[in-house]
Amino acid sequence: MEPEALALTLPIRRLVEFLLRTGSIDSRFTGFDRALEGARLHRKLQRAAVKEYPDYQAEATLKQDYACAQITYTLEGRADGIFTDTDGMPTIDEIKTTTLPPELITGEQSPEHWAQAQIYAAIYARQNGLPAMRVRLTYFQVDEELEFRFSHDYTADALDAVVTDLLTQYAPWAKRAAEWQRISRASLAALQFPFPGYRPGQRAMIGAVYKICTEGGQLLCQAPTGIGKTMSVLFPALKAVGQGGPVFYLTARGTTRAAAENALALLRASDAHLKLRSVTLTAKDKICMQDRRECTPEACPYAKGYYDRVRTALWDALDTHALTADALQMLARRHKVCPFELGLDLSLWCDVVIGDYNYLFDPVVHLERFFDTAGDYLFLLDEAHNLPDRARGMHSGVLAKSAFYDAKKRLGKGKSSLKNALTKVNDIFIEWRHRCEEAPGDSRFGRTFFEKSRADTLDRALTRLCEPLEIWLDEHRDPDETHEALLQLYFDIRAWLRVADTFDDHFVLQISAHGSEVRAAMLCLDPSDFLTADFAKGRAAVLFSATLAPAGYYRDLCGLPDARAVALRSPFDTEHLGLWCARHVSTRYKDRADSIAKVADLLAVMSGARAGHYLAFFPSYSYLQQVWENFTARYPDRPTLCQESAMNEGKRAEFLAQFQKSDGRSLLGFAVLGGVFGEGVDLTGESLIGAAIVSPGLPQVGPRQEQLRDYFEQTRGSGFDYAYRFPGMNKVLQAAGRVIRTPEDRGVVLLIDDRFLAPDTRRLMPPHWEQLRVVESAETLAGELERFWGRAASLEGKAVSSPAR
C-alpha cells in the first residue's frame, strides 16, 4: 500500500533560512533600523531598476507546487524584482541591505540569499517554459551607500535541482510536522471536556466560542468569575483547530499566563492520548540565563553559534509538549542556545502559543514570522478589558529634553556634528518650554499644551540627528554607560519617528514642562483602526473578561464593529455576596479631607464584623496613605498591610502571601484601584472575605484625560463615558471580583461614594448586583453585616468566628 501523500505550504524565505542560516545572534547596533530602513532602501533600488529596465516587476508574487519524497510542497514568496537583462536573459533580482564592510561583500557570504533567489528563478522558469534564468543578488551597503551586483546564469534543470536538494533536506522536518498534525488533529477531535459536568453558563460560553472559531469572526464574551473562563475558551478553540490554527492565547500580564498553562496541563492529564504542543513566550529579560543580558557572541555563549546548533535543539525540543519557560531553559542549557530565540523558533511548530498582547499588536515586536501576512489563526485574548489602553501605549511615543542634554554632556568638550545635531533638538525643547510657561495652569505642577498636528520641526531635526548618532554608535561599541545611554536614545528616536509616520486625527501632540524638564508625547487617543488591521490577520478572535460592559464601548475601541457579544450571569448564589453602598460619603477630590475619617470608620466596621482578610481599594496612593494613617492612629490594634508605590515581583508575592495565612486574625490590606492587586489575583475561601472600593474609580482629571474626553465627545458624542465613567467602573468591577472566587465562598463588597447610585453608573453594574443595599452610616453598616454573617453561619451550620479584636 502506497504511503499517504502529504501536502505542505511553505514560505520560500522560511525554508532557506531554516536550512542554511549559520552564525550567531548579535543584537548590537547595526547602523540602521532594519525593518524601516531596509524597506525604504528596497523601494529606492526598485524605483531605480524600473528606470534602468522598462519591464522591471517589483514585488512579484510567485507560487508553485513541487513533489518531493512523497510530499507535495506549495512554495510561495515575493521576488524583489523580475526583468529582462540587456542581453535578453530573464532575470530574478534579490535585494539585500547590509552593514558589512564593502571589502567583505563578495556575493558568497550568505548562501541562503542565493538559494532564495534560485527558488524564485526555478518557479518563474517552470511557469514560463524558459530553458534558463539569470539570478542577480543586489547588495546595498548602507553606511557607504554603495551598490554591489553579483549574477549567475542557470539552466532550468539546474534550478530545479537546487529546489529538489533543499526540499530533500527539509523532508524529515516536513514529515515530522505532517505526522504531528495528523495525530494531533485526531486526538483533538476525540478530546472530551475534562470535568464530569459544566458550571452554570459554561456550556453556553463554550458553544459561542466554538461557533466563532469554526465560522470565523470576533466574539466579546463577558464571563463573571466562577464560570471557568480559561478552559471555556481553550477547550472549544482546540476542538476547532482543524478549522484554523494555531491558537494564540494572549494576555495582558505575565502572571495570568499560568492559567493557560494549567488548563492545558489539565487537558493532558485528563486524556493520555492527547497530542498537543504548546509554547509559552516569556520576556527576554526574564528568561535570559545570564547574569547580565547582552546578546552578542562575545558576551553570551548561548548567542554564539546559535544558528549552527538550533536545528538540533529544535529536533530534540519537539519531543516536549509543554514548552514552558522552565522547559525552554532546560533545553537551552542542553544545546547551548538562547532560550528566548528557541521559544520563538519553536512557536512555528506548536498548536498553542501563549504570550503577551504585544506579540500580535505591537508594531515593533509583533511576531513577523506569523503576522506579516494574514493566516488561519485563532486569537484568544484574556483580560481583554485591558486591550484599548495597552494598544494606546503601543502606538504612542515619548521623548524627554533631558535625554538629549545628557547625551551632549556625555560626549565631553569639543565640536562634532553629533553634538551640533543634539543641540538643535535641545533648542526645540527649550522653545517649547517657553511656550509652556505662557500656557495656563499652576507652574508648581507643570504646564502643558496640545497640538493636533505632528511636530514636523522636531521630526526633521531627529531625522538629521540619526546619521551622526549611528556613526558614533558604530565607532563606539564597548557597552559602557555612555554607549548604553546613546543607544537607548537612538531606539527612542526611532520609536518616535515610527509613530510620527502614523500620526493622524486619532493622535494628539502634548508638550509639557516641569522645571527644566520638557517632555513631548504623541498620544494615540483611539487605537481602533490599528486593532482592526491586527485582528484581520487571523481567522477568529475571542476577547473575554469578567468586565466587558458596555459591549458597544469595547466593540468600538477594539476596532470590532461587527463582533458578536455574549454576557453571562454569575454562576454563584447571590445570597453569598453582601453588597452595600455607603451613600453618606463623597470621595470627590474637593471632599477628600472630610471623607478620610468616615472611610476609616467604615473600613473598621467591615473588617471587624468577622475575622478574616479584607482589601480596601483607593483611587490614588496619596488618598490611600491619608486614610491608612488615620485608620492606624485610631485603630492601632488592627493589623494592616499597605501597597507601596513601586513593588517588584518579590514584594508583590510577599503582600499576597499574608492573605494566605490561616491564623484566625483579621487583616486589612490597602491597595490602589486598578493596580496589580485589583485584578488577576485569585484569593479563594478565607483568603479574602471582603473588599471596599473607595470611589467609583474615575481617572484623575488632567490634561491628557480631558483630551480623551474632548476627542470622544467630538467623534462619539460620549466624552465623559469613554474617558471617565466606563474605565472607572471597569476597575471597580475588577476589584470587587476578587471576592467570591468559588461556589463555597461568602464575602462582602462595600462601595463607598454616593456616585455609585447615579442611574448611568447603576446601569453598568452586572445582574448579580441587583441586591445592592444602601447604608447611611457606619452604625447602619454594622447592623447589616451582623445580619449577613449571621445568615451565612446558619447556612453553613457552624458558628462564625468572633469579631476581630
What is the predicted role of each segment?
Residues 1-85, 89, 115:
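Metal-dependent nuclease catalytic cores that hydrolyze phosphodiester bonds in DNA/RNA
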Residues 185-186, 192, 245-353, 361, ...:
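A substrate-engagement module of RecA-like helicase motors
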